[in-house]
Amino acid sequence: MNSSMASAGLGSRRKDPVYRGIRCRSGKWVSEIREPRKTTRIWLGTYPMAEMAAAAYDVAAMALKGREAVLNFPGSVGSYPVPESTSAADIRAAAAAAAAMKGCEEGEEEKKAKEKKSSSSKSRARECHVDNDVGSSSWCGTEFMDEEEVLNMPNLLANMAEGMMVAPPSWMGSRPSDDSPENSNDEDLWGY
């Protein structure tokens, strides 16, 4: 069995949708993109759905690579917000807005599918909206919070690595430990 057949077999067993620029971490979908001709990456956020993370990647790819970008949802290009500049903050803000819009679309599609299956169930629809401010974005009743940014994970890992390079503290003289024979006051605990 050659390697191309083996890789094709593995790919056909996957249940997760495969999109560019995203991966699943702890049950949530994260998105990031490498800046062209640089080694740095722009963190785009953590999302509850793969489609939302993929939409965030699409906006960043369009902003950084232009028409040459390979997109996850090429049919949605016209509806995506355009970042004000190519700065990481502007790209991140536009990516979050696109993810919020994609979350509303996915939520509405799921709702319509459920209504078709059970026409007797009456569920109250929530209105989806996206503001230009990333902090006030919301989608279908769920709230976005970038845990990586809140917990400062990239710096946390760097600080932990630096801590391993620090020399351990030296002991100030050698004090006898509490369980040494010199510190026992001639009492034998196990004397019968």
UniProtKB/Swiss-Prot annotation:
Location of this chain's protein in the cell: Nucleus
GO molecular function, one term: transcription cis-regulatory region binding
Residues spanning the signal sequence: none
One Pfam entry name: AP2
PROSITE patterns xrefs: AP2_ERF
SMART domains linked to this entry: AP2
Keyword Hydrolase set for record: no
BP GO terms, sorted: ethylene-activated signaling pathway; glucosinolate metabolic process
This protein's UniProt keywords: Activator, DNA-binding, Ethylene signaling pathway, Nucleus, Transcription, Transcription regulation
Chain positions covered by the region annotation Disordered: 104-132, 167-192
Lineage: superkingdom: Eukaryota
Residue ranges with Acidic residues bias: 179-192
DNA-binding region: 18-74
Similarity comment text for this entry: Belongs to the AP2/ERF transcription factor family. ERF subfamily.
Job of this protein: Probably acts as a transcriptional activator. Binds to the GCC-box pathogenesis-related promoter element. May be involved in the regulation of gene expression by stress factors and by components of stress signal transduction pathways.
Protein name: Ethylene-responsive transcription factor ERF027
Gene from which the chain derives: ERF027
